[in-house]
């Protein structure tokens, strides 16, 4: 009842938004004839006029109708493509800081040119964010023609570019790039040692393509820049052997601590927990391997890292599988994105998991890394002044977009009605029966010339289907993490006559599947080989194939398993039925599928048995459909709570990151003449704290504390301050006077040192000392924060709120880090002998770490 009410409420709201936009659409359409009469030069001059009006008080909203009409007319002349009204609607929604749900094939790339042009008029930069380098390069090269025609510049920000080329890309009016590159560039910019080395401008407006993948699917994996630390590969190799002496138990047999087994697996949470028996056995084994001392606890502070390594080894063996979660290529473990099926080159799991998997596979273990800088996509993209996005599937995650990013979701109507036939799910008892039915469906499609796209959830499943098709001599293409380079080409031709394409999850997003094959790809492929006459033959052949595919029923989608998220299922279905084309879809399931096995109710399994489903017989019933939907909703809610919890913890780190980067940027942006004042402030802060630490009374008397203060100043900072002699000589000394005496001595001592060593670039040296020291303590703080986060849940057993405890402890850790870094800066500047060589050493060390 509540779901129906919410659905109706959202539908009414969506309709109201679209209705309100119609006035603007009518205004844009009324300008079309006028703009058609303008020359190319006059159309281009509109950009200059818009910028002038913007600088003189007009708003972007006031310029919207004319700017959209300008882009539409320019597109007609450059591409021969006219923006449909629904694309204008999408452009307006994107400009209004919302998420536009636009079905596959509705022209999201062309739609994005409208808000990109309008917001680029501010000359503050527009970042269009794509999922991979191929899409960024493709869209930039295509749309550059349009934007250059209108007098705007376009940059491409992809992996492998030099800092110089990146800076050029960011200085363009509109920049195309990947989510990873934008995030990593932000982190790298906050690690540089001079302002000129930064590549990004102020983060103004980001428009995210496939926004659901970036802000939801990838939000759990933070961007991390790491540096190598101590090699502990022998420890991982030894701990990998512990798998042979530990055995699991069923979760329902016990709670976390009691049971006959050594550990149990929580598949829902993807975690492994040691039982009390397992803890004892593990400690005994570690003692035998000389990894811990006899009678030592695995939970003691000195062994907590080993504890994490043991759990990582168990997770590596029982929760992470080859050709599902990762592949082994060139003797390296490469992560497979669970949502897209794409490999994630260069990315490594944290918490020792990656090393544990390398040990499991018998590969060379790369040394563990220390985090130098990190940020989640959630917090990175919230740094932009303005954010919007588009995707074919967003409505199921509308609540999360609103709750976390303050983004409303609007469903954009299709240009032509969608006529795809979504057939009901078929559920089999076993996986073997399910795959037999899938193969039979593929055979029938091929026999009637119908193209088929088969979506799988893992490389393993895609290769299983491929092997079955090979035995039947059915030609097909496999698209998974192992064949990433062929992705766009294969998916573009998945609509050809009798084409059978097996794709892992949503590999190939961003490339349209055209019935009969992608004509643009075909023409580009044949352009170098054939004459104009031959090219006409290619077009004629395509038209024949296109019509035959339409008669066969269009692209048929086969889902081999329901994904944890309905949105991913909708993405697969959305590949068919584009722009009013015919098409069909069906999902095949079995009671052995992970979703149903882990999350469905026992009642559903019982009903399947009571019905007495025969071998190779499927069940299709509203009750089953509802049970599957309930299972998916359970997982979606769990994943949302997980992402929400991750964000709550990361928000604490994010606030500290914001303060730290602000202070760091103050140092970088300060003129050399101001660095001296910053040094004085640091000296003042540190030495006042030192005086307050030793001296409590207002009027000084001879005491042990005064001698300790003198010793501290002498030993740690080379400052000789004879306070005790003054007191012995009966000179009255107050605490306030003492602070002034100490600071005066400090300033004199430091000035003498500068004069003595005649350092040419003293201010640059000071700047580098401050930055290098701050960065060192920040790295150590990040490691401490991670250890705190990993163990904070244990506070719950003491009736304390782990989140509040994390906030409280991390706050004091941060203050201590800032205080310790200032103390170290002062110690280096006062105690260390300095020369021009020291300047070079610190500079080179900083560059090496970076």
Swiss-Prot record:
Pfam families: P-loop_SecA, SecA_DEAD, SecA_PP_bind, SecA_SW. Keywords: ATP-binding, Cell membrane, Cytoplasm, Membrane, Nucleotide-binding, Protein transport, Translocase, Translocation, Transport. GO terms for biological process: intracellular protein transmembrane transport; protein import; protein targeting; protein transport by the Sec complex. CDD domains: DEXDc_SecA, SF2_C_secA. Its EC number is 7.4.2.8. It catalyses: ATP + H2O + cellular proteinSide 1 = ADP + phosphate + cellular proteinSide 2. Belongs to the SecA family. This is Protein translocase subunit SecA. It comes from Buchnera aphidicola subsp. Baizongia pistaciae (strain Bp). The lineage of its organism: Bacteria, Pseudomonadati, Pseudomonadota, Gammaproteobacteria, Enterobacterales.
């Amino acid at each position: 009842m509540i779901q129906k009410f919410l659905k109706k409420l959202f539908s009414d709201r969506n309709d109201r938004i679209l209705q309100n936009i119609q006035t603007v659409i009518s205004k844009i359409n009324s300008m079309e004839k006028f703009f058609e009469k303008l020359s190319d030069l006059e159309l281009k001059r509109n950009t200059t006029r818009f910028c002038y009006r913007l600088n003189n008080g007009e708003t972007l909203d006031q310029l919207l109708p004319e700017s959209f009409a300008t882009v539409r007319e320019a597109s007609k002349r450059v591409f021969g493509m006219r923006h449909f009204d629904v694309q204008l609607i999408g452009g307006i929604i994107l400009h209004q800081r919302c998420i536009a749900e636009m079905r596959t094939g509705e022209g999201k790339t062309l739609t994005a040119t409208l808000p990109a042009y309008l917001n680029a008029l501010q000359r503050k930069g527009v970042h269009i964010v794509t999922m991979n380098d191929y899409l960024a390069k493709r869209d930039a090269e295509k749309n550059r023609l349009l934007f250059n025609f209108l007098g705007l510049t376009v940059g491409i920000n992809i992996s492998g570019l030099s800092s110089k080329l990146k800076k050029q890309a960011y200085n363009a009016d509109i920049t195309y790039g990947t989510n990873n590159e934008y995030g990593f560039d932000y982190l790298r910019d906050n690690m540089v040692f001079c302002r000129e080395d930064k590549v990004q401008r102020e983060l103004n407006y980001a428009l995210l393509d496939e926004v659901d993948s970036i802000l939801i699917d990838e939000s759990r994996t933070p961007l991390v820049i790491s540096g190598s630390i101590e090699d502990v590969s022998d420890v991982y190799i030894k701990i990998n052997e512990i798998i042979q002496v530990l055995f699991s138990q069923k979760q329902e047999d016990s709670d976390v601590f009691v049971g006959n087994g050594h550990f149990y697996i929580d598949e829902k949470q993807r975690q492994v927990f040691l039982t009390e028996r397992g803890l004892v056995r593990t400690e005994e084994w570690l003692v035998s391997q000389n990894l811990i001392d006899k009678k030592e606890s695995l939970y003691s502070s000195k062994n907590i890292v080993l504890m994490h390594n043991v759990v990582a080894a168990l997770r590596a063996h029982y929760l992470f599988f080859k050709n599902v979660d990762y592949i082994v290529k060139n003797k390296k473990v490469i992560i497979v994105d669970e949502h897209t099926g794409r490999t994630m080159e260069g990315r490594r799991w944290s918490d020792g998991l990656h090393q544990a998997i390398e040990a499991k596979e018998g590969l060379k273990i790369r040394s563990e890394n220390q985090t130098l800088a990190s940020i989640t996509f959630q917090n990175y993209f919230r740094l932009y002044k303005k954010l919007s996005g588009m995707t074919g599937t967003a409505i199921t995650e509308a609540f999360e977009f609103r709750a976390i990013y303050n983004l409303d979701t609007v469903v954009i109507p299709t240009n032509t009605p969608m006529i795809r036939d979504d057939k009901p799910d078929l559920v089999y008892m076993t996986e073997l029966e399910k795959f037999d039915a899938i193969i039979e469906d593929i055979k029938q499609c091929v026999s009637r010339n119908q193209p088929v796209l088969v979506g799988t959830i893992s490389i393993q499943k895609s290769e299983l289907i491929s092997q079955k098709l090979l035995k039947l001599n059915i030609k097909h293409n496999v698209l998974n993490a192992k064949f990433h380079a062929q992705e766009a080409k294969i998916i573009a031709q998945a609509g050809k006559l009798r084409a059978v394409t097996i794709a892992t999850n949503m590999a190939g997003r961003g490339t349209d599947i055209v019935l009969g094959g992608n004509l643009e790809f075909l023409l580009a492929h044949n352009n170098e080989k054939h004459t104009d006459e031959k090219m006409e033959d290619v077009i004629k052949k395509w038209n024949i194939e296109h019509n035959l595919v339409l008669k066969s029923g269009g692209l048929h989608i086969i889902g081999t398993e329901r994904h944890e998220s309905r949105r991913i299922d909708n993405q697969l279905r959305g590949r068919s039925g584009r722009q009013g084309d015919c098409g069909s879809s069906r999902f095949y399931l079995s009671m052995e599928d992970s979703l149903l096995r882990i999350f469905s109710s026992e009642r559903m399994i019982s009903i399947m048995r009571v019905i007495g489903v025969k071998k190779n017989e499927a069940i299709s019933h509203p009750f089953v459909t509802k049970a599957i939907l309930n299972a998916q909703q359970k997982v979606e809610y769990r994943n949302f709570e997980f992402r929400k919890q991750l964000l709550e913890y990361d928000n604490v780190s994010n606030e500290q990151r914001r303060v730290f980067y602000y202070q760091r940027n103050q140092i970088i942006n300060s003129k050399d003449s101001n660095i001296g004042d910053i040094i004085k402030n640091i000296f003042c802060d540190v030495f006042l704290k030192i005086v307050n630490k030793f001296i409590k009374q207002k009027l000084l008397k001879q005491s042990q504390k005064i001698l300790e203060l003198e010793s501290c100043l002498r030993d740690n900072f080379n400052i000789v301050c004879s306070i005790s002699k003054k007191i012995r000589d009966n000179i009255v000394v107050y605490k306030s006077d003492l602070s002034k005496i100490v600071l005066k001595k400090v300033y004199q001592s430091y000035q003498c040192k500068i004069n003595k060593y005649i350092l040419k670039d003293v201010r640059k040296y000071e700047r580098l000392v401050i930055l290098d020291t701050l960065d060192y303590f920040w790295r150590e703080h990040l490691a401490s924060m991670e250890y705190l986060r990993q163990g904070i849940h244990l506070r719950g057993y003491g009736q304390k709120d782990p989140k509040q405890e994390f906030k409280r402890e991390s706050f004091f850790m941060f203050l201590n880090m800032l205080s310790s870094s200032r103390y170290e800066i002062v110690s280096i500047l006062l105690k260390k002998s300095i020369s021009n060589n020291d300047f070079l050493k610190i500079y080179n060390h900083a560059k090496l770490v970076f």
